[in-house]
A protein has these predicted regions:
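Cleavable N-terminal export/targeting peptides
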Residues: 1-31, 184-192
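Short glycine/proline- and aromatic-enriched beta-strand/turn motifs that initiate or cap beta-hairpins
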Residues: 24-67, 192
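Predominantly the C-terminal beta-signal and adjacent terminal strand-loop region
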Residues: 25, 131-192
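Outer-membrane beta-barrel channels and translocator barrels
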Residues: 30, 69-73, 106, 145-147, ...
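Residues that define the transmembrane beta-barrel architecture of outer-membrane proteins
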Residues: 31-33, 54-60, 91-95, 130-136, ...
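Transmembrane beta-strands of outer-membrane beta-barrel proteins
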Residues: 33-37, 76-78, 111-115, 149-153, ...
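Glycine- and aromatic-enriched membrane insertion/assembly motifs of diderm outer-membrane
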Residues: 34, 51-94
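Transmembrane beta-strands of outer-membrane beta-barrel pores
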Residues: 41-45, 82-86, 117-121, 144-146, ...
């Protein structure tokens, strides 16, 4: 598991970094790539079929992102993020890889949605939880024009059963609120 996770993290990092060429100014063409960092607050809980109530876990997330323009309004945004999830007294820490399709409005606002795969890296009891968590992410963000700084609000809706020790299906559900910075936001970085 750890060997596979190291390979996957390395692969995603290589994809985000390789192929970056020259910086130019102007509108972003297809293939324009911007790298960034992000971090913020998580508010997560576990939802299950038996409606057992869990107290919310407030944690944090921290990660890297790649912003790949398809044209002036559409982009893909793959990310590599550490995320503290689960619920109070049920700590589940993941490395998440969301791949979002993003629509960019001319005023700096963006809407986004896409799948996310999470790899459990630590928990209170590893034997009780599945190592992979699939989710759907939807959200909005705002980039301050010509600065690269932005704010992001996202909802992550767990799709897969995180509980492997019971017949009761349990999923992660959470809201993330945070800040991000896109390096070289004023310039184009074109893939060759």
């Amino acid at each position: 598991m750890k060997k596979d996770m190291k390979f996957l993290i390395g692969l995603v990092t290589a994809i985000l970094i390789t192929g970056v060429a020259s910086a130019q100014h102007g509108n972003a063409p297809a293939g324009h790539v911007t790298l960034g960092v992000k971090g913020g607050v998580n508010m997560y809980n576990i939802q299950n079929d038996n409606n057992i109530s869990y107290d919310q876990r407030t944690g944090y997330y921290l990660g890297l992102l790649g912003h790949i323009h398809r044209n002036n309004h559409w982009a893909f945004q793959p990310e590599l993020v550490f995320s503290a999830q689960g619920a109070k007294n049920h700590n589940l820490d993941y490395i998440n890889i969301p791949v979002l399709l993003q629509y960019m409005f001319d005023n700096g606002f963006r809407i986004q949605a896409g799948p996310q795969v999470g790899f459990l890296i630590s928990s209170d009891n590893d034997n009780d939880y599945n190592p992979i968590d699939l989710a759907l992410s939807v959200g909005v963000s705002y980039v301050v024009p010509s600065t690269g700084f932005g704010i992001d609000l996202r909802y992550n809706h767990g799709l897969s059963d995180i509980n492997k020790s019971s017949d009761v299906k349990s999923t992660n559900r959470g809201i993330q609120l945070g800040l991000f910075y896109l390096f070289g936001h004023n310039s184009k970085i074109v893939l060759r």
